[in-house]
From Swiss-Prot:
This is ATP synthase subunit alpha. Produces ATP from ADP in the presence of a proton gradient across the membrane. The alpha chain is a regulatory subunit. ATP binds at residues 173-180. Its EC number is 7.1.2.2. The record marks 374 as: Required for activity. It is found in: Cell membrane. The keyword Magnesium does not apply. Belongs to the ATPase alpha/beta chains family. Keywords: ATP synthesis, ATP-binding, Cell membrane, CF(1), Hydrogen ion transport, Ion transport, Membrane, Nucleotide-binding, Translocase, Transport. It is a peripheral membrane protein. It catalyses: ATP + H2O + 4 H(+)(in) = ADP + phosphate + 5 H(+)(out). Disulfide bonds: none annotated. It holds the Pfam family ATP-synt_ab_N.
Length: 545
């Protein structure tokens, strides 16, 4: 057996060579965990003792996850993508990053998923940076009061429930009552502002679709393209087929994209369609993470889910660029019950609500806005002066018409004041009807409402009111500068009122009724203008007695 000799010099040289090649800067450590189980879009992972809340972690197959539950021995992770490839024992590593999304003007005209990846087949998106999804809302001292109008183009809303830039205005109602239609009309109505090229007027729009059918999202995109509104709109889509985690995150993605523009001094409109489905997705995620359920099985922090989202909508101070983000969250009710858990939560967070009634919708009153319980708490300060002047009594007259209409059902005959108010109310109600995808400029809304509340439609048959309005507006567009004056000044002064009154009277002489007769030749009960003291239900009831 040969002798083994060890040379000290060789050992010394080998150690020197190893030490000379060692580079401490290239050495790294990594926390590695392992999957315990994965199902229904949720994975439980052991290990990773230093992981942060809401940190992104990466599975061995490249799939990302969001750390939610930080328990003593395991982590509850929401899988962001397909979880079929995630199996027990798979390695999981930390990324050290929180969830963020790319942002920039490249997102205009595009359809993306909740991670900001394009899904419209139009190639990659040029980005300007990244923004965290869970970003803090602006503080109290960083805000400014809402004072600029955001026109929806819908007469019933702009006149009685006005929305200002930076406001959160809830749209609430049963399914199939026109909630999405109001939101889409509002986006379409921003086209004139966009084409003006004035950054102070332009409004960038974001439509967040949560839990909608894929065909519905495609229809919305098609409607926006047909109206030429897609060029200033981004769609964030989390359809019904997506995992619950994506539906939960989609509104935050849209908000992060919008905040980038808001902090850049621009104006943004964001629509969350709808937050009921986001709450249901968050409930599913929470139950799968084994969090304790509360009322209606929702987790205890479901209020915070929506409050931290909607508080990001704001009008920023001049020091921060005076940008704004206006939020139109949508909530779906069951059987018109606005006192349920999620509806009352969101009503308490927002600055007002537009309530849509299924009974009005089925009676062909569209948009089916119930002006009795709809309210805008801050939008009045942002309302244009001209429409504020003509709409001052509109809401009161309509409310009194509704109550008098119910009273008249049980009366055998009515006095003249009651008949006048019923006739006026029926025409005002008809005047507020509006076809979908047909928003009105504010100056045309002013003319229509002025004609209604000043008795110019009292001799027009109810079935002819919308045709009378359409032909009157065509006449004013062609023959006078009244609409131009209203658009440029936003003021309805005495001189403009006098011109408008004479033009409407002249048009009435030319108008043909549905029966082909001149309006002036149609015999109708002669109603004098309603005296202010007669517009009072108590007085009418006493007169009846």
């Amino acid at each position: 057996m040969a002798d083994i000799s060890i040379s000290p010099d060789e050992i010394r040289d080998a150690l020197k060579d190893f030490v000379s090649k060692y580079e401490p800067a290239k050495a790294a450590t990594a926390e590695v965990g392992h999957v315990l189980d994965a199902s229904d879009g949720i994975a439980h992972v052991e290990g990773l003792p230093g992981v942060m809340a809401n940190e992104l972690i990466r599975f061995a197959d490249g799939t990302l996850g969001l750390a939610q539950n930080l328990d003593e021995n395991e982590i509850g992770v929401v899988v962001l993508g397909e979880f079929e490839g995630i199996v027990e024992g798979m390695e999981v590593t930390r990324t050290g990053e929180v969830l963020s999304v790319p942002v920039g003007d490249g997102y205009l005209g595009r359809v993306v998923d909740p991670l900001g990846n394009p899904i419209d087949g139009l190639g990659e998106i040029a980005t300007e940076g990244r923004r965290e999804l869970e970003l803090q809302a602006p503080g109290v001292m960083h805000r400014k009061s809402v004072h600029e109008p955001l026109q929806t183009g819908i007469k019933a809303i702009d006149a009685m429930i006005p929305v200002g830039r930076g406001q959160r205005q809830l749209i609430i109602g049963d399914r199939q009552t026109g909630k999405t239609a109001i939101a889409i009309d509002t986006i379409i109505n921003q086209k004139a502002n966009w084409e003006s090229g004035d950054v102070t007027k332009q409004v960038r729009c974001i439509y967040v679709a949560v839990g909608q059918k894929g065909s519905t999202i495609a229809a919305v995109k098609g409607a926006l393209e047909d109206a030429g509104a897609m060029e200033y709109t981004t769609i964030v889509a989390a359809p019904a087929s997506d995992p619950a985690g994506f539906k939960y995150l989609a509104p935050y993605t849209g908000s992060a994209i919008g905040q980038h523009w808001m902090y850049g001094g621009k104006h943004v409109l964001i629509i969350f369609d709808d937050l009921s489905k986001q709450a249901e997705a968050y409930r599913a995620v929470s139950l799968l993470l084994r969090r304790p359920p509360g009322r209606e099985a929702y987790p205890g922090d479901v209020f915070y889910l929506h409050s931290r989202l909607l508080e990001r909508c704001a009008k920023l101070s001049d020091e921060l660029g005076a940008g704004s983000m206006t939020g139109l969250p949508i909530i779906e009710t069951k059987a018109n019950d606005v006192s349920a858990y999620i509806p009352t939560n969101v009503i308490s967070i927002t600055d007002g609500q537009i309530f849509l009634q299924s009974d009005l919708f089925n009676a062909n009153q569209r948009p089916a806005v119930d002006v009795g319980i709809s309210v805008s708490r801050v939008g009045g300060d942002a309302q244009v002066k001209s429409i504020k002047k003509v709409s001052g009594t509109l809401k009161l007259e309509l409310a009194q018409y509704r109550s008098l209409e119910a009273f008249a059902m049980f009366a055998s005959d009515l006095d003249a004041a009651s008949r006048r108010q019923l006739a006026r109310g029926a025409r005002l109600t008809e005047l507020l009807k509006q076809p979908q995808y047909s928003p009105y400029p504010v100056e045309e809304q002013v003319v229509s409402i002025w004609a209604g509340i000043n008795g110019k439609l009292d001799e027009v048959a109810v079935e002819d009111v919308l045709r009378f309005e359409s032909e009157l507006l065509d006449h004013l567009r062609r023959n006078t500068g009244i609409l131009t004056t209203l658009r440029d000044t936003n003021v309805l002064d005495d001189e403009t009122v006098e011109k408008l009154s004479s033009e409407v009277d002249a048009f009435k002489l030319e108008f043909q009724t549905g029966e082909g007769k001149p309006l002036a030749a149609v015999g109708r009960e002669d109603f004098d203008a309603i005296a202010e003291e007669d517009v009072n239900q108590e007085r009418i009831v006493k007169a009846k007695r």
